[in-house]
Structure formats: structure tokens, C-alpha cells
């Protein structure tokens, strides 16, 4: 695990991820506290894509893939899973810090008809966990299929554009991968947005279950 951490968390990735979170909390203005989580989710999806797209293909770019292929499929699969886990944990910790930075740099007000601050944060943590998981797994999967980090990022970006828009909201409804962002914040009892997160979780787990077969192909 320590060796995998050194591979997937080099200094430059940590620096640009932290810089991204700081800049986001400075430039994206919010008025009410409920807007903080909604503001963070879509940009962090893109960060997860860029951050995790090279989870395996860096082996190809660094010419380590020939050595990597000598290992059993199970060991190679576990290696990729460990890398994804390490990156996701880092991104989730950063997402929590980013949430706090909005309160540090700005002074959002509590909306009178929304949940309590702790409830809002709890919902945000659950939603952003699924978001980071889904986009990181998808980015790695597409990169492995096309054997190109840029193709993986490009494919994810197309889905991001299609779903993170008013058209996407109307088309996908509660099944939108960004259902948390588009949910009715003034109606806490409306939990239909969980359908979108359940879909993300299902697809992400399915892609992980198919990972050994994908490893065999490369």
C-alpha cells in the first residue's frame, strides 16, 4: 500500500488538487450554506477524473507495463484497487477541507427552510463520496479501455457536460449522476435524488467487478 501511495500521490498531484480546492472556494460565490455542497460537486467530479485517469495507464506511459504483466491478474487487480482507494480517500479529505474553506473565505447564511448545518454537511459527505467513487472508477476504466489517459478524460468530460446542465436535469431527472446538485433543497423530504446516487454506486461497483477481465486484456 505504501508503494502504491508513492505512485499515485506524487507531490505535483497533491499541489494541483489542493490549489484547485482553494481557488474554487475563492472564486465561486455562494449566498446560502446549502449552496456550498452543490457548488463543489460538479467541479470535484472533474478533479476526480483528471486525478484518477492515470491510475493504471501511467504504467504504460512509464514502460512499467511489461513488468506489471508478469504478475498474476489478481495481484494486478488488487494493485489498481489500492491505488483507486488511496486517491479517493485523499480526494474525500480534500472535499471536506474545501467545504470548510467556503465558510472561511466567505460568510454564507443559513436558509430558513433548509436542513441544519450538520445535516447539510452529512448529506454532502454521502453525496460527494459516491461522486468521487463513480468518476474515479469511470475515468480509470475508460483510460484502460482506450489505453490513453486523455481518451478517458475526454469520455468522462462528455458525460459531465451532458449531465451537468439544465438539459441533462430535464432528460435524466432523478437518475442524473448530479442529482444531488439538482435536488430540491427546500424540500428535505424529497429523496428522489438518491436514485441518481444509487445509479452511480451501482455502475461504479459493476465496473470494479469487471476490472479483472479488463486487466487480462491489457
Model regions and ranges:
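Hydrophobic core of alpha-helical transmembrane segments in multi-pass integral membrane proteins
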Residues: 17-27, 92-101, 157, 197-211
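Aromatic- and glycine-rich beta-strand/loop motifs that create alpha-glucan
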Residues: 1-14
Amino acid at each position: 500500500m505504501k508503494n502504491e501511495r508513492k505512485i499515485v500521490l506524487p507531490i505535483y498531484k497533491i499541489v494541483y488538487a489542493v490549489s484547485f480546492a482553494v481557488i474554487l472556494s475563492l472564486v465561486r460565490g455562494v449566498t446560502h450554506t446549502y449552496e456550498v455542497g452543490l457548488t463543489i460537486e460538479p467541479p470535484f467530479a472533474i478533479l476526480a477524473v483528471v486525478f484518477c485517469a492515470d491510475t493504471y495507464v501511467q504504467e504504460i506511459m512509464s514502460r512499467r507495463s511489461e513488468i506489471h504483466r508478469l504478475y498474476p491478474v489478481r495481484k494486478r487487480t488488487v494493485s489498481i484497487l489500492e491505488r483507486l482507494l488511496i486517491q479517493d480517500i485523499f480526494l474525500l479529505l480534500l472535499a471536506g477541507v474545501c467545504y470548510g474553506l467556503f465558510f472561511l473565505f466567505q460568510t454564507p447564511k443559513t436558509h430558513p427552510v433548509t436542513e441544519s448545518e450538520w445535516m447539510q454537511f452529512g448529506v454532502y459527505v454521502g453525496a460527494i463520496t459516491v461522486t468521487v467513487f463513480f468518476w474515479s472508477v469511470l475515468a480509470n476504466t475508460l483510460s484502460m479501455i482506450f489505453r490513453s489517459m486523455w481518451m478517458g478524460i475526454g469520455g468522462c468530460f462528455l458525460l459531465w457536460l451532458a449531465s451537468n446542465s439544465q438539459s441533462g436535469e430535464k432528460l435524466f431527472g432523478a437518475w442524473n449522476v448530479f442529482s444531488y446538485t439538482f435536488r430540491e433543497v427546500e424540500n428535505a423530504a424529497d429523496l428522489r435524488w438518491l436514485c441518481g446516487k444509487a445509479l452511480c454506486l451501482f455502475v461504479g461497483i459493476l465496473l470494479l467487478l469487471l476490472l479483472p477481465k479488463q486487466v487480462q486484456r491489457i
